Amino acid sequence: MDATKTTFKAGFEKLNKDIERFPHVFPITEDMHITYEGVSRLVMLDRYSYKDSTKETLSEGDLVILTVKEDPKYPARGTGTILSINLKDQTARIRVSAEYQHNIDDFEVEEGGIMTRRILTLDKPLELFYEQIAMRNAHGLAEVEITPELRHEAFLKFYEEQKALNFIPAGRVLYGAGSGTDVTYFNCYVMPFVPDSRGGISDHRKKVMEIMSRGGGVGSNGSTLRPRHTIVKGVNGRSSGSVSWMDDIAKLTHLVEQGGSRRGAQMIMLADWHPDIFEFIISKMQNPRILRYIIENFEDEQIRMLAKEKLHFKP
């Protein structure tokens, strides 16, 4: 027997059997070879590969994607192999791939880079080859054609161009096309100006959340919002300002996951003529040394006060 075929059968026969349960995923064939390496491979598997989201096929020996180091802002992702599954506790023991073991916290790992994780937190990619993703994309994009013949022709054209890397769709298309999920194919959305009212801000926030939940990034401009301390006549109060309202919208970024480790992306803007512009700029500063420099060297009392507020802020 051909040694290549023996290796193929040993490596992917089970996965192809699992794939039969997922009508949108194409099986691995012997002519597929594009897998990428390092970060490129992790991004492909984590963000674009079709997953068994219900874990119905998860078993020993499977390749999975997991968070190897927990962090509220910058969690480290990696790949690993399932060693055993505890159905009672809904956990799995995983040997983390060698290239990601350096990210693991020492207190979480056993000898040999073995970790225990809840099954719920694992992702099992079904598309290990770029050609599988290209086939799914081509099939999905060709569905708009009106006859079977035209659909087949479009499928072949899309697939050959994408496989040859002559045409690479945007990330949201790689993730969504042909997947049967109701996600967006657009990476970025530019929103209308935010209406200067509680109802208008709430509606804007709702739209941002909906776009992000379907995979899109959002740009919002808060220049239409009234400045900080402005009188709100209807309730005889004062506004907390454009920065506070836009910060609330920006926090959606940390709440909405978009598949794998990808979180929603936003660009929050404010015009340079807006009275809150200094507060806006300082709110984006992360380096304490810069804030201290501003406090110690700037003469403008408003700017110094804003820098002090930012430096001493504790969420």
How would you name each of these model-derived features?
Residues M1-P315:
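Extended catalytic cores of very large enzyme megasubunits
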